[in-house]
Amino acid sequence: MFDELTQRDIDEMKSEIDERIKLRDGFHDDIVTAKSYGDLSENAEYHEAKRAKNKNEARIRYLKNMIKTAKVIDEKRDANTVGYFDRVTLLFEDLMEEQVVTVSTKMRIDATKGVISKESPLGSAIFERRVGDRVFVDVSPDVQYYVVIKKIERDGNSIDIPINKY
């Protein structure tokens, strides 16, 4: 399965890869310096330098794989439906409470700030729906509910939602 990403997501990931590649020499130097301290079995600096290098390399591999397997999506869509980077005001019927969420790509989610993925149960239920639509959200056999889309706002500040670190 491909991850749906915007061209902006891919450009930011490529930029991060370039920055992380520039850090490689520094990690190598840290390892060489730590090795010079002697016995590696009890050398915390050496193990920390290796851990930092490996974490950097893992992030580079992850980002390259995300780019390689990405399906580039077009952010343009029907102006009257929920799309990527829209702020959506929802009425949760069972609680009679309103909540605002922003629908995003997988690389920019942050549930603590109300930024949800299109692939999430709520995101997939409201995606491409219109104001006034009553939508069924199926989280699991035990958790199901209805929401009503009250308002859709185009979020011109989607660039402020950073790429997730992990």
Where are these regions (language model features)?
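N-terminal cationic and glycine-rich segments that engage phosphates or anionic surfaces
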Residues: M1-A58, I159-Y166
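Residue-level signal for pocket-adjacent positions within structured domains
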Residues: K35, I67-K68, A111, S117
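Conserved, well-folded catalytic cores of nucleic-acid-processing
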Residues: R20-L23, D30, A34, L63-A70, ...
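Non-DNA-binding regulatory cores of transcription-related proteins
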Residues: I73-G156
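Flexible domain-boundary/linker segments
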Residues: D30, E48, L63-M66, N80, ...
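Internal alpha/beta loop-helix hairpins
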Residues: H47-N80
